[in-house]
C-alpha cells in the first residue's frame, strides 16, 4: 500500500477526553474516529487490525468444528420475555418500538435468538452436538461509555452457542472451546491468562474468562507462580492457614478509643499490628435481618464469596449506619464479636487469630486481647476474603501473584438456563422429548484491539504483535523526490516484497524523514526499512524492528534472506 494513496491521518496531540493509552493512541494513529458517546468509526487503518483479529477468530472457530451464521441485530421482545430477561437486564438493554408499536431491542447478546433458531431447526438427538457462531455488532447502552473501544456502547463480538443432549457432551465441547480460545489468543501474540470466573448476568455454572494482562486492566486476576492455576480474584480461594490459633498470651480488656472509627485509626493511635485487628462488616441477611462478617484488618471482604453464604441476601447489600445502630446500639466503626447480637460468620484467617482487637459494640470502645473460646465462642467459619499476592496457591503448588487484566473472552456452561424456559427440546434415542443443554462462548473482537495496545506500546506509539499489525513492514525512502537511485531501489523493493506476499506500507509521501519515522512508530508497524542515498552508496539499507533500540545495516544482496528470517 502506497502512503500517498492511503487515508493516513495521524496527530501529535493527545485528545483531552482520552483517559487510557489505547484510546489515546487509536485516536492519534487515526484508527478510530468518535461519532457520539461510545460510538466509533473504524478507519481503513483501524479496520485492517480489526479484520486481522476477526480472521484469527474465524479460522480457529472453523477449525474447532463450529459453523458460522448471522443473526439479526434487532430482536423481538417476545423472545426476551420468554427467557425472563426483558425485565431483568436493566437500562443497558436498548429497547425500541417499530412503527406498529411492537417492542424490540438491539441485541447485547443472542442467547434467545439462537435458542429460538435451534428449537425450530433441530428435532433429533442425531443433529447434536451443534456449535454455531457469528461475528456481529452488539450494543449495550452503558451509562458512561469511556475508554474508547474498550468500553464502547457499540462493539464487534464473536458469540458462539453450543447445543447438546447431555452435560457430558457439553463438558467435552467446553474443553474444545477452552483450547480454541487458548489458540486464538496465542495467535494474536498477546500475554494472557485463562481464569475461573463468575457467570454474571449470562447465567450457568462453569465459567472461564480470558484476560490480557495489562496495568490498566479493570479486573484483578490471581495465578500461581509454579502451576497453571489461575482465577478471577473474586473466585480465587484463600487457603485456610495451617494449624490452630496460638494459645492466649493476653487478658481481654476494654479500652476507650475515642475517635477510632477505622482499622487505620486503631493501628496509628494504639500501635497495634494490623494483622492483630479484626473488622466487622454488617450486611443484609436472607431472612430480612442483619448478618455480621468478620475479616482481618488488612484483608478485604470478597463480595462474591459473601453472597454465596445461604444466610446472606443476594445481591449483597451493606447495612447502613441507622440499621446497625438500631440492631447493636453502636456505629459501624465500633463493632466486634464479643456479645454481638447478630449472627456471625468469620473468615478462615480470623478463626486462627489470638489476642486480637475488635470493637466492643459501644461507640468509642474496643476490646484488646480477644481470644476464641475463652472470650467468645467461635462462630461459623468460611472463606470470605480476597486473596493477596503471596498467598498459597489453592492447588498446593507455589504462591499467588496478582495482576491486572482486561477481559477479552468469556466461556460458560449455561446448562438449561435458556432451553428450559424456551422449551428447546429434541427427540432422544427413546423417542422422548428432551431439553437440550447449552454452552456460550464470547470474544470481544474490537476489545482485543484495544487490549493489544494497552499491553504493547511505548512513549512513541503502538507496538503491534506481528499477527495483528495493520502492515508487516514499513518501507521508508529518504529524499525519494530528489534521488533517482532511492526512487528506483524503493520501487524495486516494493514490487519484490509485494510479489512475495509481504504487506508493505510504502511511505512515498513528500514529507520530512522525522515525520515519516514518527508516523511509522505511532501506528506500530513491526518492521521498518529505510532507503537513503548514503546507504545505497555502501550497498545497504537500514532495518529496525519496532521494539529495537538500534538500527541495523543490511546488505542489499542479503536483504531477502534477512527479511524472511525476520518476518517469519
From Swiss-Prot:
Its EC number is 6.1.1.15. Pfam families: HGTP_anticodon (PF03129), tRNA-synt_2b (PF00587), tRNA_edit (PF04073). GO terms for cellular component: cytosol. Its main location: cytoplasm. PROSITE patterns: AA_TRNA_LIGASE_II. PANTHER family: MITOCHONDRIAL RIBOSOME PROTEIN L39/PROLYL-TRNA LIGASE FAMILY MEMBER, PROLINE--TRNA LIGASE. The keyword Ligase applies. Belongs to the class-II aminoacyl-tRNA synthetase family. ProS type 1 subfamily. This is Proline--tRNA ligase. Consists of three domains: the N-terminal catalytic domain, the editing domain and the C-terminal anticodon-binding domain. It is an enzyme of class 6 (ligase). GO terms for biological process: prolyl-tRNA aminoacylation. Keywords: Aminoacyl-tRNA synthetase, ATP-binding, Cytoplasm, Ligase, Nucleotide-binding, Protein biosynthesis. Homodimer. GO terms for molecular function: aminoacyl-tRNA deacylase activity; ATP binding; proline-tRNA ligase activity. HAMAP family: Pro_tRNA_synth_type1 (MF_01569). It catalyses: tRNA(Pro) + L-proline + ATP = L-prolyl-tRNA(Pro) + AMP + diphosphate. InterPro entries: aa-tRNA-synt_IIb, aa-tRNA-synth_II, aa-tRNA-synth_II/BPL/LPL, Anticodon-bd, Anticodon-bd_dom_sf, Pro-tRNA-ligase_IIa, Pro-tRNA-synth_IIa_bac-type, Pro-tRNA-Synthase_IIa_type1. It comes from Alkalilimnicola ehrlichii (strain ATCC BAA-1101 / DSM 17681 / MLHE-1).
